[in-house]
């Protein structure tokens, strides 16, 4: 077994901080721009950064060869769950969103077991059970009342996590050997095209130009 080094711990903390802060920014921006319009801006921003790298490194051929599976994964890993989380961020806090996001490994393992017949060891099952119980304990706070829209937001976030877990399994089983850059950039491209008409329809009447929320996108 590999020993966990200080660098491994530092990288985990750094990535956790980045991932966790995204929910805070989502909470700040989603009520301002609206969920779908916000996500369209985010995927377009990501595509603008990665597309030059794809062209420069010659990864476009990989996307062209595997575009059908990349498109399928992008819907389950970007377009739909991003919008679900953005909708949830309008009604529940960033802390709760990050807790719900912790169910992604649980859903991923369940999909692997049910769909791909992967065997889970007793220790894996025990870990999943403990993780699930931990999320339930943190989620059901007796001192907090969500209301009907709050519970709908929680369900939306859970569905997003289920889609993430499904996308992970699709990627592992169908996109082996394809570069992460091609998958990510291709996914952003497909997601931006799929969301474009919905974003145009759901765009805010007045764009908050000069608003600090623009920085958080």
Could you say what each language-model-derived stretch is?
Residues 50, 71, 111, 120-142, ...:
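Hydrophobic transmembrane alpha-helices of multi-pass small-molecule transport proteins
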Residues 18, 22-23, 51-101, 137:
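Specific transmembrane alpha-helical segments of multi-pass solute transporters/efflux pumps
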Residues 29, 38, 42, 88, ...:
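Hydrophobic/aromatic residues within transmembrane alpha-helices
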Residues 49-61, 104-129, 202:
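C-terminal transmembrane-helix exit sites in multi-pass transporters
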Residues 61-69, 98-101, 117-137, 147-153, ...:
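Loop-to-transmembrane alpha-helix entry segments
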Residues 30-38, 82-102, 176-182:
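Structural motif at transmembrane-helix junctions in multi-pass transporters
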Residues 1-39, 146-173, 181, 193-195:
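Glycine-/small-residue-enriched transmembrane alpha-helix faces in small-molecule transporters
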Residues 215-217:
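Conserved small/polar residues in nucleotide/adenosyl-binding loops
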């Amino acid at each position: 077994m590999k020993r966990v080094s200080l660098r491994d711990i530092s990288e985990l903390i750094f990535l956790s901080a980045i991932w966790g802060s995204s929910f805070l920014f989502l909470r700040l921006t989603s009520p301002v721009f609206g969920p779908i319009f916000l996500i369209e801006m985010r995927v377009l921003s990501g595509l603008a950064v990665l597309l030059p790298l794809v062209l420069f490194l010659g990864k476009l051929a990989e996307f062209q060869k595997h575009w059908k599976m990349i498109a399928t994964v992008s819907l389950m890993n970007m377009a739909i769950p991003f919008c679900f989380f953005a909708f949830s961020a309008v009604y529940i806090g960033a802390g709760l969103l990050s807790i719900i996001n912790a169910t992604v490994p649980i859903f991923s393992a369940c999909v692997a077991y049910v769909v791909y017949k992967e065997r889970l060891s007793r220790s894996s099952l025990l870990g999943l059970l403990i993780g699930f119980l931990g999320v339930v304990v943190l989620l059901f706070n007796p001192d907090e009342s969500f209301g009907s829209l709050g519970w709908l937001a929680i369900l939306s976030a859970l569905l997003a996590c289920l889609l993430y877990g499904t996308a992970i399994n699709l990627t592992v089983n169908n996109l082996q050997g394809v570069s992460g850059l091609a998958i990510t950039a291709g996914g952003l491209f497909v997601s931006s095209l799929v969301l474009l008409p919905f974003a145009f329809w759901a765009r805010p009447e007045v764009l908050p130009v000069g608003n600090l929320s623009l920085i958080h996108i």
